[in-house]
């Protein structure tokens, strides 16, 4: 078998299924561990989560009228279909704090709204501070789905400048992600995932590409997916505000520069005109030839002929 097929079937072998059974057997122990070691700052959120888990356990163990609630299952499937995932399975977070939906949203009734709020209250979000190199969202979803059903998943791509620099010097052309957030349908599954994988190897087959990668994952108590989308929208707004401020400052600098250039041209033209007017006041003297005439009635001074110059004498000497 090729290396790619081994990577795709890392977590589908019988050994992994046995490991999965062991992990879910430890679920009750880890949940009790969380109840015993909560901090003072997170007591209020943990109490609410415990109540939600009890309500969730009651609904799971005691279905209404001895039948499964197929409406919840259908609603979850519809919500998963409406999630805007890209080709890699990464949830697309829009600026308005929600996922992209092509169809028009229908108004929810009071019952549907209460049901949706209850579903959101049951969810839990984990933060992944480091994503294994070149791991795609679809692969991460298949790895973490061992612990429970995953609703949405978002991985932050690396900076484009870093990617272009790596490719320019002959590096790997695959996409790389820096951090991510994973939303579990049940917060107990999110706690179990964080307690099991945090600080440990990803595991699987030894031939796996991600076998030795250390996972750093943390459960975020009281944190919902809406908080993440609002935070991203806020960061985008701050970035747009900074960009608009820089553009306005640059426009002011350009206007001041153009006005200064026009003023300098105007001053230069004024000074040039002043110089021309000053030059016109200068009185110039021109040498003129004396007036002579051959008229008989003219004065003797005017009848005198001009004396030959040196140039004329030289020419006459050469001729004669």
Curated annotation (Swiss-Prot):
Phylogenetic classification of the source organism: Eukaryota, Fungi, Dikarya, Ascomycota, Saccharomycotina
Question: Could you tell me where the Polar residues compositional bias lies?
Answer: 27-39
Alphabetized UniProt keyword annotations: Nucleus, Ribosome biogenesis, RNA-binding, rRNA processing
Which compartment or compartments is the protein found in? Nucleus, Nucleolus
SUPFAM superfamilies linked = RNA-binding domain, RBD
Functional summary from the UniProt entry: Involved in the small subunit (SSU) processome assembly and function, and in the 18S rRNA synthesis. Required for the early cleavages at sites A0, A1 and A2.
Q: State where composition is biased (Acidic residues).
A: 40-56, 73-90
Q: Where are stretches of biased composition, namely Basic and acidic residues?
A: 1-10, 57-71, 276-285, 296-309
* InterPro entries attached to this UniProt entry: ABT1/Esf2, ABT1/ESF2_RRM, Nucleotide-bd_a/b_plait_sf, RBD_domain_sf
Cellular component, GO annotation = nucleolus
- GO molecular function annotation: RNA binding
Where does this chain mainly localize?
Answer: nucleus
Q: Which residues does the annotated region (Disordered) include? A: 1-98, 272-309
The record's family statement is: Belongs to the ESF2/ABP1 family.
Q: Which domain of life is it from?
A: Eukaryota
Q: What is this protein called?
A: Pre-rRNA-processing protein ESF2
User: In which organism is this protein found?
Assistant: Candida albicans (strain SC5314 / ATCC MYA-2876)
Q: Where is the RRM domain?
A: 124-214
Q: Biological process (GO) annotations? A: endonucleolytic cleavage in 5'-ETS of tricistronic rRNA transcript (SSU-rRNA, 5.8S rRNA, LSU-rRNA); endonucleolytic cleavage in ITS1 to separate SSU-rRNA from 5.8S rRNA and LSU-rRNA from tricistronic rRNA transcript (SSU-rRNA, 5.8S rRNA, LSU-rRNA); endonucleolytic cleavage to generate mature 5'-end of SSU-rRNA from (SSU-rRNA, 5.8S rRNA, LSU-rRNA); small-subunit processome assembly
């Amino acid at each position: 078998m090729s290396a790619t097929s081994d990577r795709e079937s890392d977590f589908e072998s019988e050994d992994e299924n046995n490991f999965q059974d062991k992990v879910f057997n430890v679920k009750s122990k880890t949940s009790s561990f969380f109840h015993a070691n909560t901090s003072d700052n997170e007591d209020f959120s943990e109490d609410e989560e415990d109540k939600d888990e009890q309500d969730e356990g009651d609904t799971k163990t005691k279905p209404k009228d001895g039948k499964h609630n197929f409406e919840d299952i259908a609603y979850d499937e519809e919500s998963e279909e409406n999630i805007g995932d890209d080709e890699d399975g990464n949830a697309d977070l829009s600026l308005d704090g929600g996922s992209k939906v092509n169809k028009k949203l229908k108004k929810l009734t009071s019952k549907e709204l209460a049901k949706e709020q209850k579903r959101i209250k049951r969810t839990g979000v984990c933060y992944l501070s480091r994503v294994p190199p070149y791991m795609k969202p679809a692969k991460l979803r298949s790895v973490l789905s061992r612990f429970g059903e995953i609703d949405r998943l978002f991985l932050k791509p690396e900076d484009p400048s870093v990617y272009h620099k790596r490719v320019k010097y002959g590096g790997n052309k695959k996409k790389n992600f820096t951090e991510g957030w994973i939303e579990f349908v049940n917060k107990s599954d999110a706690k179990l995932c964080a307690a099991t994988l945090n600080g440990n190897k990803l595991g699987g087959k030894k031939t796996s590409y991600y076998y030795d990668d250390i996972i750093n994952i943390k459960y975020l108590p009281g944190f919902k997916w809406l908080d993440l989308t609002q935070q991203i929208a806020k960061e985008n707004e701050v970035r747009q505000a900074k960009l608009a401020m820089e553009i306005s400052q640059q426009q002011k600098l350009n206007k001041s520069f153009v006005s200064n250039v026009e003023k300098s041209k105007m001053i230069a033209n004024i000074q040039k005109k002043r110089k021309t007017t000053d030059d016109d006041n200068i009185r110039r003297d021109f040498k003129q030839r004396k007036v002579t005439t051959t008229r008989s009635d003219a004065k003797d001074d005017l009848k005198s002929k001009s004396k030959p110059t040196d140039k004329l004498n030289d020419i006459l000497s050469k001729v004669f």
